[in-house]
């Protein structure tokens, strides 16, 4: 079982990998290599959409608990190359202001980075043109991201700064929890599903839900990184997410997770997080019991100074994303606590009956 230091190393390695919707191969390869080193305990398979499912070997005595995280992040995909002129499309949600003359880094098949400047971008078609600093062996299908200069960051004692915390920090947390669960009989039903193309409408999750990539009786813990706000700050603990902009999640499952965090005195927050929709919505829509867990995220989708930009006051500067290290470790702990807790019952009626009996005299 890995220690906290090793888990932070996985976090640093994963969140530094270039990825984009539909071209997540670097992340998937990292995970496959990680799983291969644990082949005595784990199985790994890919569904027809390219999502990866990691399960524990041995007999399962309870319905699965599946932590779901996505392997993509908003990014550029090369569509054409003419010497130093590179045509790109952008996949994911970023405000138009951040594209104006931005520096970017495109990666070839050997993982070498090639820098350039975005000289044209149409937010309607989400297509643009990059002028490279020098010619490079790029081909259609290669991917890119913002170039942060000396601000790429790393994992420190308090914070992690990285190109893609969303949702590769979630991937790291899910794998860390799975690594801890190995060999623990009471956690043998914990597994991990890593999805693709979340940033363009959680397409991979929809495919997994439609095809029943995980059994119908699975309990889904959908992991996200969600924009931090004053009421959901970095360092306040991982968030038990009761719903999103599209749906409210399974109330009993959500309450069981919250109660597990409370009983174990795990620092956490409980919020709706209605700023967007997440993969839990897809699983709920297709009949699964699902709830959400998320990490508060600074510089959401690499949009630095976002609050000021939204108010028309700040400079739209692409920056590395930021999460709290204590939130990250707390999420790993919460995943395992939730796995043990979800087979319980949440009987609110009994509590209300007791309250009624003790206070009904007030009604006269």
Where are these regions (language model features)?
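N-terminal hydrophobic/helix-forming segments and targeting peptides
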Residues: 1-364
